[in-house]
Amino acid sequence: MSEQLVTPENVTTKDGKINLLDLNRQQMREFFKDLGEKPFRADQVMKWMYHYCCDNFDEMTDINKVLRGKLKEVAEIRAPEVVEEQRSSDGTIKWAIAVGDQRVETVYIPEDDRATLCVSSQVGCALECKFCSTAQQGFNRNLRVSEIIGQVWRAAKIVGAAKVTGQRPITNVVMMGMGEPLLNLNNVVPAMEIMLDDFGFGLSKRRVTLSTSGVVPALDKLGDMIDVALAISLHAPNDEIRDEIVPINKKYNIETFLAAVRCYLEKSNANQGRVTIEYVMLDHVNDGTEHAHQLAELLKDTPCKINLIPWNPFPGAPYGRSSNSRIDRFSKVLMSYGFTTIVRKTRGDDIDAACGQLAGDVIDRTKRTLRKRMQGEAIDIKAV
């Protein structure tokens, strides 16, 4: 994947300027040092960028005019633009965001006491999970740091400007949009660092969640890079079913995946000792009571809570949505084993913003050999 990778070290724009949204605080301080400035100037600019969603150096009134002029010559603050907005009857908002000549989708989900932003990490996805709309679009490229944190920046600016409507500020971010975050570690981790940074968005590490389908070598590496909440897209109680609906399982099976999860939990404080298990409910595929018993046995040594997700259909999908009665029976079996089990409330399905429905506008550049490599052969973390 190295030909598609954009790293934080290569952040100049087409006009030769540095997009400051591509830099975490350490990189920002190095940039200001190269300008002959003190590190605290970087902190001041970051505060303007993220606390006030400011992208105009002239509005940064505690920065002297000479430095503002210098910044305008060599840098910019450019977040990707929203090109389409859809609002659900339940208050969910989906934004289509332009990244070059393509689009990714970002979803804002307000609740009584919080508001969650679902953020994309790639243009498309190469993992080919059979129940997910994004996977059917193919894969084009990784998003760069500015395109990931820029989704949060853009959403915060929109929500902040609309306080009179009662919309809540963003309290949680979930890396559960388009793409597999662990296949874009070089850009996802710096973006999450900005989310956590007090001069960035200042979110608690327990309120930033990364979801993965099981790229085990990258998960091993993640624990040494950053501490955030972890959710895993399990979706099956055994390898036979998971091989079919989550093809990466053919390389990194459930036992290997869960072992890596337990290792991450040993390093992490953000998870409070347990991982979130995501389990999409597919009618008569993985939703029987026998599957629930298998799942309980599978997870007996993995501290977790379980989110059961009613499947959200999309055109051409080969599955059906589990009935409420089947979901209820499945949930009761898990609870009888003592598992905290939640049936996720579907949000935004009337605008195709629910789990598994994000599609965007993707020019598929995924080569057949690349898909095979990602599903069935070792993944080189240096190229992730």
UniProtKB/Swiss-Prot annotation:
Cofactor details (free text): Binds 1 [4Fe-4S] cluster. The cluster is coordinated with 3 cysteines and an exchangeable S-adenosyl-L-methionine.
Location(s), subcellular: Cytoplasm
GO molecular function, one term: metal ion binding
EC number: 2.1.1.192
Cofactor(s) essential for the protein: [4Fe-4S] cluster
Keyword annotations: 4Fe-4S, Cytoplasm, Disulfide bond, Iron, Iron-sulfur, Metal-binding, Methyltransferase, rRNA processing, S-adenosyl-L-methionine, Transferase, tRNA processing
UniProt KW rRNA processing keyword: yes
Domain (Radical SAM core): residue spans on this chain: 111-350
Any Gene Ontology CC annotation: cytoplasm
Catalytic function, reaction form: adenosine(2503) in 23S rRNA + 2 reduced [2Fe-2S]-[ferredoxin] + 2 S-adenosyl-L-methionine = 2-methyladenosine(2503) in 23S rRNA + 5'-deoxyadenosine + L-methionine + 2 oxidized [2Fe-2S]-[ferredoxin] + S-adenosyl-L-homocysteine; adenosine(37) in tRNA + 2 reduced [2Fe-2S]-[ferredoxin] + 2 S-adenosyl-L-methionine = 2-methyladenosine(37) in tRNA + 5'-deoxyadenosine + L-methionine + 2 oxidized [2Fe-2S]-[ferredoxin] + S-adenosyl-L-homocysteine
Pfam families documented for this protein: Radical_SAM (PF04055), RlmN_N (PF21016)
Binding site residues for [4Fe-4S] cluster: 125, 129, 132
Function noted in UniProt: Specifically methylates position 2 of adenine 2503 in 23S rRNA and position 2 of adenine 37 in tRNAs. m2A2503 modification seems to play a crucial role in the proofreading step occurring at the peptidyl transferase center and thus would serve to optimize ribosomal fidelity.
NCBIfam families recorded: PRK11194.1 (NF008396), rRNA_mod_RlmN (TIGR00048)
Additional remark text: Reaction proceeds by a ping-pong mechanism involving intermediate methylation of a conserved cysteine residue.
UniProt similarity note: Belongs to the radical SAM superfamily. RlmN family.
HAMAP family per the UniProt record, alphabetical: RNA_methyltr_RlmN
Name of the molecule in the record: Dual-specificity RNA methyltransferase RlmN
